[in-house]
Curated annotation (Swiss-Prot):
GO terms for biological process: glutamyl-tRNA aminoacylation. This is Glutamate--tRNA ligase. The gene is gltX. It comes from Thermococcus kodakarensis (strain ATCC BAA-918 / JCM 12380 / KOD1). A motif ('HIGH' region) lies at residues 107-117. The keyword Acetylation does not apply. It comes from the Archaea. It is an enzyme of class 6 (ligase). Catalyzes the attachment of glutamate to tRNA(Glu) in a two-step reaction: glutamate is first activated by ATP to form Glu-AMP and then transferred to the acceptor end of tRNA(Glu). It holds the Pfam family tRNA-synt_1c_C2. The lineage of its organism: Archaea, Methanobacteriati, Methanobacteriota, Thermococci, Thermococcales.
């Protein structure tokens, strides 16, 4: 038994180490018995041992857990380092030194985090971990007018990243750093590398497109500083003055020519700073300053934002800084799923969607609500990798990855959609004992009792099988012959118990329940949300957030458990 205890301790420590210090007894049991099938016959004595060891491990600090794991199983850390690049398939980073890589993810908290954003976030985090570096979460919230941040999204984004398995080393919020941006803006003005433009926007655009300098561009530094102070003091109104970075007026892309760095927003009503500040940096200026200030070494950026680097390099060159290594990748989308924050917001406001976690959406919260595991999302992003071309994945791709992860952990139950009563003649009382999971008998069984004077319920989806003269097998119960179908239900007659009879005759198998509990399953179908009403096994032991398999229906996540009804959300087949 001591050898088994050592084995359990090893798996408990590994599970705790990879799950922020909290080992899961079920996961440890599954690992012990799954990789040592000869122990399954001793499951009853091993389960209490696992619970005891897991409690001991969970009482240790993270540092104590790691030290103990290194003591009894140092190979884990060697294998872990070897597998990082092999398993995940990410190529080496250019100019990357172990322990010195710093990456960042800079979302705008104006909406929920979605699968499209996840590409840059996951790549940034994976490489930071691969090189034992640092991962920074930086909220880009300096546009209180067009992309207005909302307090809830700061928390949601952080929660979503942590759910995805991120270890966030630092968190910075751009709106807390306005004074820093002001200092750098003033330095650039004093250096003659930036100026305050008071041209009407249309006039500047006309000059820019012709490659002609704005009349304020070469005015003395003293004049520029005076205008700058007026911007800060509120003497200019919104749209009357802009700080611009001097660039090449003949650059082939007009948007790069003397691009705007800071502008005025009257009454910003920012959720963090209120109306304290009126001068706000635009993305490229704030990002350039922060990437330097925070020591970012590598940036992962969508191909559509490649021009940002061109703009920001002017700031870096003027200060003599080295620009971070930039890795561009294509956009990621999923067939039939909306990722656009503006379209999602509009749909929510119009009542089309239930919220940011509506299971039809592609937000991380929606995917989580639907039963997609964080490991599946990470694996998908890593599989796509650093391709520069845009990538559209099908739901089936994500489902296939998720299925591998949840199949071993999902207990099985019968759910009968659109139930129809079936009255079986000639059968005696019988209790079917069905494994919660066919591959893990140690989890126990469900018991469904058939009583001759009560009907069983079968699904309307199987109506084509219920024709007089047909034979079907009620799964894990017995075989019946269909005698009659009418408006009151189905009349059938007991034929035999043996599964072999059904198999030899190729009779179809259907699932069933007796007196089940009311259950509805929400099934996302493109832009539609179909609600399937039905019955779930009356003794089904399900809790909110459980992921289970409704046999012959699909994998679902339990969304709500009420006294009168269970609500589940369909994930995939």
């Amino acid at each position: 038994m001591e050898e088994i205890r050592e084995l359990v301790l090893k798996y408990a420590l590994i599970n705790a180490y990879t799950h922020r210090g909290k080992a899961n007894p079920k996961a440890v049991i599954g690992k012990v018995l799954g990789e040592n099938p000869e122990l399954r016959k001793r499951a009853k004595e091993i389960i209490p041992l696992v619970n005891e060891v897991v409690n001991e491990v969970n009482s240790l600090s993270l540092e104590e857990q790691e030290a103990k794991l290194r003591e009894i199983y140092p190979e884990f850390f060697e294998e872990k380092n070897e597998k990082k690049e092999e398993k995940k398939g990410l190529p080496p980073l250019p100019k990357a030194e172990r322990g010195k890589v710093v990456t960042r993810f800079a979302p705008n908290p104006d909406g929920a985090f979605h699968l499209g954003n996840a590409r840059a976030a996951i790549l940034s985090h994976e490489y930071a971990r691969m090189y034992d570096g640092k991962f920074i979460l930086r909220f880009d919230d300096t546009d209180p007018k067009v992309k207005r941040p909302e307090p809830i999204f700061y928390e949601w984004i952080k929660e979503d990243l942590e759910w995805l398995g991120f270890r966030i080393d630092e968190i910075h919020i751009a709106s807390d750093r306005l004074e820093i941006y002001y200092d750098y803006a003033e330095k650039l003005i004093k250096m003659g590398k930036a100026y305050v433009c008071t041209c009407p926007p249309e006039k500047f655009r006309e000059l820019r497109d012709k490659g002609i300098a704005c009349p304020h561009r070469e005015e003395p530094v003293e004049v520029q500083l005076e205008r700058w102070r007026k911007m800060l003091n509120g003497e200019y109104r919104e749209g009357e003055a802009v700080v611009r970075i001097k660039t090449d007026l003949n650059h082939p892309n007009p948007a790069v020519r003397d691009w705007p760095a800071l502008r005025i927003i009257d009454n910003p009503n920012h959720p963090r700073t209120g109306n304290k500040y009126r001068v706000w940096p635009l993305y490229n200026f704030a990002s350039a300053i922060d990437d330097h200030e925070l020591g970012v070494t590598h940036i992962f950026r969508g191909q559509e934002h490649a021009e940002n680097e061109t703009r920001q390099r002017y700031v870096y060159e003027y200060f003599g800084w080295e620009y971070p290594v930039t890795v561009h990748h294509g956009r990621l989308s999923i067939e039939g799923v909306i990722l656009s924050k503006s379209k999602t917001r509009k749909g929510i406001e119009e009542g089309k969607y239930l919220g940011w976690d509506d299971p039809r959406l592609g937000t991380i919260r929606a995917l989580r609500r639907r039963g997609i595991k964080p490991e599946a999302i990470r694996e998908l992003i890593i599989e796509v990798g650093l391709k520069r071309s845009d990538t559209t994945i099908s739901w089936d791709n994500l489902a296939a990855i998720n299925r591998k992860i949840i199949e071993p952990i999902a207990n099985r139950y019968f759910f009968v959609a659109d139930p129809i009563p079936m009255y079986v003649e000639g059968a005696q009382e019988f209790t079917a004992e069905i494994p919660l999971h066919p591959d893990y008998p140690e989890r126990g069984v469900r018991r469904l009792k058939f009583e001759p004077d009560k009907p069983v319920y079968v699904s309307k989806d199987d109506m084509e099988l219920f024709k007089p003269g047909n034979f079907v097998r009620l799964k894990d119960l017995f075989n019946v012959e269909i005698m009659e179908v009418n408006e009151n239900g189905i009349r059938a007659r007991f034929h035999s118990f043996e599964y072999e009879v059904a198999r030899e005759n190729r009779w179809r198998m259907v699932h069933w329940v007796t007196e089940g509990k009311a259950c509805e399953v929400w099934v996302p179908e493109g832009d539609e949300l179909i609600i399937r009403e039905g019955l779930l096994e009356s003794d089904a032991d399900v809790k909110v957030d459980d992921i289970v398999q409704f046999e012959r229906f699909g994998f679902v996540r339990i969304d709500d458990v009420r006294p009168e009804k269970v609500v589940a959300i369909f994930a995939h087949k």
